[in-house]
UniProtKB/Swiss-Prot annotation:
Additional free-text comment from the UniProt record: Heme 1 (or BL or b562) is low-potential and absorbs at about 562 nm, and heme 2 (or BH or b566) is high-potential and absorbs at about 566 nm.
Record-linked Pfam families: Cytochrom_B_C, Cytochrome_B
Keyword Transmembrane among record annotations: yes
CDD domains (UniProt xref): cytochrome_b_C, Cytochrome_b_N
Binding site for heme b b562: 54, 153
Amino-acid positions noted as binding a ubiquinone in the UniProt annotation, renumbered to this chain: 172
Keyword Nuclease: no
Name of the protein described by the UniProt record: Cytochrome b
Species this protein is from: Raphus cucullatus
Length: 267
């Protein structure tokens, strides 16, 4: 229950490693992006495994972060204001990273997801439309959008790593929380071998279901629509995000007014 911080660290390391390997074979161009992902899966040694681990690793990242936040809420970790606030920034940065990453394969749901979510900024009075066109780099989601999304997806994980160090620095100021909410000083034990072995056990227990998912049901959490290359002329019957954003999308769609939905989501 107290392990999810270390699991998030290993998730981040795994995602950066698999992501760098994928970036080596990816082409950030609307005409080539979809083909380059297919090429990675078909022709690159273990490319299919790297892609499956990266896609499902994102799901595990969100499972761990939601449990980590849930535990923090239950045990009052929000009282450590600096640690909590850096954690909130980390969550938002992670969501931004996952969103721009989902656009990169340039499948149908990638394209339409990018169109729908970036369009939300147009709900801002006066400057909204200008912001959207500035983000797109034109009058629709196109090549400039994909290029800048790839840049952001490459950059943001390193920003997350930096924020994680700040998060841990603030945590070390107060010491770790515990179920009783009292000082942990009297319970301090050597990091090695106790915590190191505990973390290795946690990593093993997380990698087992991740590998099972990546090897036996790699597309279980994905959208079949994304196996179709992006087509700006055909809207998918249901535009929906990955499971880890469904709560946000539900808030957004629960109010029948664009600005109202955006405000509810922001709140």
């Amino acid at each position: 229950w107290w392990n999810f911080g270390s699991l998030l660290g290993i998730c981040l390391m795994t995602q950066i490693l698999t992501g760098l390997l994928l970036a080596a074979h990816y082409t950030a161009d609307t005409t080539l992006a979809f083909s380059s992902v297919a090429h990675t899966c078909r022709d690159v040694q273990y490319g299919w495994l790297i892609r499956n681990l990266h896609a499902n690793g994102a799901s595990f990242f969100f499972i761990c972060i939601y449990l980590h936040i849930g535990r923090g809420l239950y045990y009052g970790s929000y009282l450590y204001k600096e640690t909590w606030n850096t954690g909130v920034i980390l969550l938002l940065t992670l969501m931004a990273t996952a969103f721009v990453g989902y656009v990169l394969p340039w499948g149908q749901m990638s394209f339409w997801g990018a169109t729908v979510i970036t369009n939300l900024f147009s709900a801002i009075p006066y400057i909204g439309q200008t912001i959207v066109e500035w983000a797109w780099g034109g009058f629709s989601v196109d090549n400039p959008t994909l290029t800048r999304f790839f840049t952001l997806h490459f950059l943001l994980p390193f920003m997350i790593a930096g924020l994680t160090i700040i998060h841990l620095t603030f945590l070390h100021e107060s010491g770790s929380n515990n179920p009783l909410g009292i000082s942990s000083n009297c319970d301090k034990i050597p990091f090695h071998p106790y915590f190191s072995l505990k973390d290795i056990l946690g990593f093993t227990l997380m990698f087992l279901p991740l590998m099972t998912l990546a090897l036996f049901a790699p597309n279980l959490l994905g959208d079949p629509e994304n196996f179709t290359p992006a087509n700006p002329l055909v809207t998918p019957p249901h535009i929906k995000p990955e499971w880890y954003f469904l709560f946000a999308y539900a808030i957004l769609r629960s109010i029948p007014n664009k600005l109202g939905g955006v405000l509810a989501l922001a709140a």
